[in-house]
C-alpha cells in the first residue's frame, strides 16, 4: 500500500 505521504518518502 503506497499512500502519498508528504513528510515521509513514498513507498514504491
Curated annotation (Swiss-Prot):
For this UniProt entry, what's an example GO CC term?
A: chloroplast thylakoid
List where in the cell it is found: Plastid, Chloroplast thylakoid
* Lineage top rank: taxon: Eukaryota
Keyword set for this entry?
Chloroplast, Plastid, Thylakoid
Q: What else is known?
A: On the 2D-gel the determined pI of this protein is: 6.0, its MW is: 21.3 kDa.
Q: What is this protein called?
A: Unknown protein from spot 110 of 2D-PAGE of thylakoid
Origin species, per record, is Pisum sativum (Garden pea)
User: What are the top taxonomic ranks of the organism?
Assistant: Eukaryota, Viridiplantae, Streptophyta, Embryophyta, Tracheophyta
Amino acid at each position: 500500500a503506497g499512500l502519498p505521504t508528504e513528510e515521509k518518502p513514498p513507498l514504491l
